[in-house]
Amino acid sequence: MKKIISIILFSLALFQTCGRIYAQDETFGKTSLRPKLKFEARLDYNNDNKNDDLSGIKGYIVDLKLEGDLSPRFSYKYRQRLNKPVKDATFFDATDWLYLTYKAHRNISLMAGKWIVAVGGWETEPAPIDIYQISEFCNNYSCYQWGFNVIFNTTNNQNQVYLQICESPFRKQYKASTGNGKEMWAYNALWIGNIDFFHAFYSANMMEYRPGKYLNFIALGNRFDLGRKVALDFDLQNRASRASDFFKDYTLSAQITYRPLPAFQCFAKISHDRNNTGNGSDPTVFDGTKLTRLGGGVEFFPLKNDNLRLHGHYSYSWGRNTNPDGVLRDGQSIVNVGLTWRMHILK
């Protein structure tokens, strides 16, 4: 009940603020109401020495993206995965985004709907169709949830702050393990900042992993532009359900990307997941896990844009994963090559 009252009061305060702002700033000029519609698909050949079911030629992702404006103040975005199985008898399990944004002021927006959970780190930033290698944490984390966002944007567009209330990404895992579909929430604050060659993707998060029990995150995503052709990412994510857990449950990841030509890019990446808390509160990286993944790949863009992409990637994992249903395994070797194409149906 306290959570419900807090959410209602928070919403009322936002709408009251919006009313005042709207009275001060009534127009943003003309806008086009023509929607944009894009079709995306990726076809892969995968060879996984630890999982034969994932080996072979596979359709990896097919999705549709729709976005546009309803007015100068209202905009929408929608992305539906056509290949993702629908679970729990709901169409929206295959929906990544479905949200409406209200631009209350040049520097303040409100968003409601399904969107990514506001956790920092550049590893979580790419769309699934653009991902080749992720950590064990990301493999066990439901990153798209229903919720509400308040977005503050600086006038120079170099900094954004997101305040978010959404459903906990651990709700389905709790239901699967206990059989109880309880209401569970996450409270997130995210800062995206651009300071010359440095780009920050930082967050602080409180997420219920059981009703009334919170797993707290500090996620620090750092990107450095090393000239025009090289970028270096370094992410640190610490998870703790109590103060004594600090830096006992964490994920580190780093990636370097080199793009010497518009049509060619290569990268190398490493991640390390570890949980030594002994309390079993983290549903993503189980207690006793100590796991490293190293890999690299190349991308070729024959059309010199992202409408057509060829890729090749290899990764190797080693260590201990105590999650019996985990994704990464000791001695796991994965080879992946594939083709991605994007079609602009409406521009």
Predicted features by range, described:
Residues 25-45, 53-170, 193-194:
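Outer membrane beta-barrel
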Residues 60, 94, 106, 144, ...:
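Exposed loop/turn and edge beta-strand positions of beta-sandwich/beta-sheet ligand-binding modules
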Residues 34, 40-52, 88, 99, ...:
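Outer-membrane beta-barrel pore domains
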Residues 55-57, 93, 139, 180, ...:
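Aromatic-acidic/polar surface patches that form glycan- and anion
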Residues 1-26:
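Bacterial Sec-dependent N-terminal signal peptides
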Residues 135-142, 179-183, 271:
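Short, well-structured alpha-helical patches and their helix-loop capping segments
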Residues 147, 186-188, 219:
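Short glycine-rich loop/turn motifs
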Residues 162-213:
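Loop-centered beta-sheet repeat module
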